[in-house]
């Protein structure tokens, strides 16, 4: 099975207008990513406010994204839920639509044991036939995979990657030392992506690449082509943007940045609220300093 989880993967925002999906804006956003030659996109993940969508909106968003992309790059659907049956349903609907893979985090709020986390993913795996990227994001879920659970899950044939949005930079080395199969490790934090790659990572699932996909793609390419100095130069240039995108809860700052660049409205769904004036000013200054052209 081809491993689609590598390189630069953009976690796409979901644009709204008058509290409805703005599908015209979605097309502009996706074409911007495709023109920058990103390796794949994630739809309806954390950055895409997936948990704030109705099931009908989720289906419409995925179908529209799949139609726009039209097989030019892989489309990965966020299928996370704290209800295993619902996660299976999201994966089943995604499969019908024709996505290329899933990104799934452990169930939030319920605080399952490691045994429960394993069974949750095993059930989704057995009910589907597409590749899965595990998504470690303990700051949101309240639980995380242990190394032992990752090792156990990696033995399931279609679990091919781990997106790690934690801060344990020793983890890639530990995992690589005990897992025999190809399990691609991707960083979920833009600001840590180079350090993560240095420990065995193969790419980044990025928020910042919504805004500047060409630079983010160039950074990953330079690193993997052993141009460490070039990659570090881009990383240092983008570091203020990385930091600004998390001064408030993601995706609040990135949604404003995309509005400022002219892609969409600044609408974001409750319980999230739009960026403060201080954050807006910071984002505007950074975008201006980067001379981003769209």
Swiss-Prot record:
GO terms under cellular component: cytoplasm
Family: Belongs to the DapA family.
Function: Catalyzes the condensation of (S)-aspartate-beta-semialdehyde [(S)-ASA] and pyruvate to 4-hydroxy-tetrahydrodipicolinate (HTPA).
Protein name listed in UniProt: 4-hydroxy-tetrahydrodipicolinate synthase
Quaternary organization: Homotetramer; dimer of dimers.
Ligand binding (pyruvate): 47, 205
One GO term (biological process): lysine biosynthetic process via diaminopimelate
Gene, per the UniProt record: dapA
Active site: 135, 163
EC number: 4.3.3.7
PROSITE patterns: DHDPS_1, DHDPS_2
S-S bridge residues: none
Family annotation (InterPro entries): Aldolase_TIM, DapA, DapA-like, Schiff_base-form_aldolases_AS, Schiff_base-form_aldolases_CS
Chemical reaction(s) catalysed: L-aspartate 4-semialdehyde + pyruvate = (2S,4S)-4-hydroxy-2,3,4,5-tetrahydrodipicolinate + H2O + H(+)
Any one GO MF annotation of this record: 4-hydroxy-tetrahydrodipicolinate synthase activity
Top-level taxonomic group: Bacteria
Compartments it resides in: Cytoplasm
Membrane-traversing stretches: none
Any single Pfam family the record assigns to this protein: DHDPS
Keywords: Amino-acid biosynthesis, Cytoplasm, Diaminopimelate biosynthesis, Lyase, Lysine biosynthesis, Schiff base
Predominant subcellular localization, coarse grouping: cytoplasm
Site (Part of a proton relay during catalysis): 46, 109
């Amino acid at each position: 099975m081809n491993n689609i989880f590598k390189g630069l993967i953009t976690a796409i925002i979901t644009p709204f207008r008058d509290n409805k999906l703005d599908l015209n804006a979605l097309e502009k956003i996706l074409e911007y990513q495709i023109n920058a030659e990103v390796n794949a996109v994630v739809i309806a993940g954390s950055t895409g406010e997936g948990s704030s969508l109705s099931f009908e909106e989720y289906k419409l968003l995925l179908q529209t994204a799949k139609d726009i992309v039209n097989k030019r790059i892989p489309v990965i659907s966020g299928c996370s839920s704290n209800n295993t049956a619902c996660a299976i349903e999201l994966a089943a609907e995604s499969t019908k639509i024709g996505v290329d893979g899933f990104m799934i985090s452990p169930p939030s709020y319920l605080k399952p044991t490691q045994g429960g986390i394993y069974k949750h993913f095993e059930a989704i795996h057995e009910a589907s036939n597409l590749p899965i990227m595990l998504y470690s994001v303990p700051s949101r879920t309240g639980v995380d995979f242990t190394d032992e659970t990752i090792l156990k899950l990696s033995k399931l044939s279609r679990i091919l990657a781990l997106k790690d949005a934690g801060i344990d930079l020793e983890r890639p080395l530990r995992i690589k030392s005990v897992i025999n199969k190809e399990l691609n490790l991707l960083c979920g934090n833009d600001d840590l992506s180079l350090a993560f790659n240095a420990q065995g990572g193969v790419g980044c699932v990025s928020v910042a690449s919504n805004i500047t996909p060409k630079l983010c793609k160039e950074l990953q390419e330079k690193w993997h082509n052993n141009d460490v100095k070039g990659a570090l130069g881009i990383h240092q240039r983008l570091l203020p943007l990385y930091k600004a995108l998390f001064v408030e809860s993601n995706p609040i700052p990135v949604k404003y940045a995309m509005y400022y660049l002219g892609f969409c409205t600044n609408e974001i769904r409750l319980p999230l609220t739009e960026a403060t004036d201080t954050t807006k000013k910071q984002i505007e200054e950074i975008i201006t300093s980067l001379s981003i052209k769209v």
